[in-house]
Amino acid sequence: MKKSAILTLSMGFLLLFAWHIQAIDTPEAREHATKIRALALSHATVNNIEIAYKVIGEDDHPAVLLIMGLGASHILWGDNLVMQLVDAGYRIVLFDNRDTGDSQRLEEFGQPLLWWQLLKARFGFDVDADYTLEDMAQDSVALLDELDIEQAHIVGASMGGMIAQAVASNHPSRVLSLVSIMSTPGFGDHLPPPSTEANDQLTNMAKDKVDNKARLRQLGIYTESMPRQIMAVIKSGDRTEA
């Protein structure tokens, strides 16, 4: 396991966060910024986990399951994207992954010692994780079962793209299409890294917009779950051949 594991996740998070900041920082977005938040949350126990979710759109329209990334809740998808999909004739399923947002939090597991787990992975030893991407993919499919949705377009961003890949690999009959956004099937060969200038711009954008944990929560970001979810990614390994 290379240090690129953390680099990939970190860059994915920064891109995800920058995308969200840009999505909400327009007059149109501000005008409609409460649409998703205003919808009542539903809860269902699926795969032995309580999942918080929302469904927008007509029951007979093709379903789109949106899977968010590392430590992030469903609100980061933003009203503009979601409402454009609804207006285009899709039924949108939004939900919070296990251990983040309003879904069941798994704080009883505590925080992994990341440096130790990464060191173990670096030298080929098995790492410890409280759950895997496959578990999170099963949560997604179980939610579709709960909603009586036989098939859906599966869309994931960052770590959500990894979960979406696992859904497509393990449950191909449930997938109409797969959209994996700013994600990766594993930690092997990579595209060239971003320039220092681009990386600094993303980092500074995040620093400028966020000054404390309460603000992060308002934006739908839950830092407490990130170490456990990073371990889920590392534990799950590579999906390139899948």
Per-range role (PLM):
Residues D96, H153, S177-V179:
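Residue in the alpha/beta-hydrolase core beta-strand immediately N-terminal to the catalytic nucleophile
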Residues A29-E50:
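N-terminal cap/lid segment of alpha/beta-hydrolase-fold proteins
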Residues K235-A242:
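Conserved serine/cysteine hydrolase catalytic core
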Residues A121-A152:
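Conserved acidic catalytic loop of the alpha/beta-hydrolase fold
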Residues M68, A152, G156-S158:
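Conserved alpha/beta-hydrolase "nucleophile elbow" surrounding the catalytic nucleophile
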Residues M162-S169, L178-K207:
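Flexible "cap/lid" loop of the alpha/beta hydrolase fold
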Residues M136, I154-G156, I181:
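Short beta-strand immediately N-terminal to the catalytic nucleophile in serine-hydrolase-like folds
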Residues V46-L119:
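Conserved HGGG/HGGXW glycine-rich cap/lid loop of the alpha/beta-hydrolase fold
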